[in-house]
């Protein structure tokens, strides 16, 4: 089934000029870029995007990290794109990352893990709509 999912290239990766490498990794794996924009989130936007985590101990540090530098929001499309991209991303936990995944290659820590990806079809729709209008997705 053809799906769309959201990829965020996080501040740790944008600051280290890894945008091109990460996008190449995704395209080489068969995902198509349908929309892309570089964004500087403010506190309110970051809190809104991660609202489901409000109240958790990692929420405030995550928001601070996400507003520390620009991010790149990308809509990816492909066969089973959500699961495919999550496999390419790798685990959040550094000890569980498989070699060759984006996070194994580029992450600095559990929080500074270079990329975000939608975890379900429902999340993908909500997250894509957070950054893109329908006519921005080509």
Curated annotation (Swiss-Prot):
Protein name as catalogued: Nucleoside diphosphate kinase
PROSITE patterns xref list: NDPK, NDPK_LIKE
Cofactor: Mg(2+)
Family to which the UniProt record says this protein belongs: Belongs to the NDK family.
Function: Major role in the synthesis of nucleoside triphosphates other than ATP. The ATP gamma phosphate is transferred to the NDP beta phosphate via a ping-pong mechanism, using a phosphorylated active-site intermediate.
One matching Pfam family: NDK
Molecular function terms from GO: ATP binding; metal ion binding; nucleoside diphosphate kinase activity
Signal peptide coordinates: none
């Amino acid at each position: 089934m053809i799906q769309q999912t959201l990829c965020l290239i996080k501040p740790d990766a944008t600051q280290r000029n890894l945008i091109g490498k990460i996008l190449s990794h995704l395209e080489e794996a068969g995902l198509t870029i349908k929309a892309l924009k570089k964004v500087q989130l403010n506190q309110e936007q970051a809190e809104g995007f991660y609202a489901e985590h409000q109240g958790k101990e990692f929420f405030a540090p995550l928001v601070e990290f996400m507003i520390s530098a620009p991010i790149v929001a990308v809509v990816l499309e492909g066969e089973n794109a959500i699961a495919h991209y999550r496999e390419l991303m790798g685990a959040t936990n550094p000890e569980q990352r498989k070699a060759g995944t984006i996070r194994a290659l580029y992450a600095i820590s559990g929080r500074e893990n270079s990329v975000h990806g939608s975890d379900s079809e429902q999340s993908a729709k909500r997250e894509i709509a957070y950054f893109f209008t329908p006519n921005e997705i080509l």
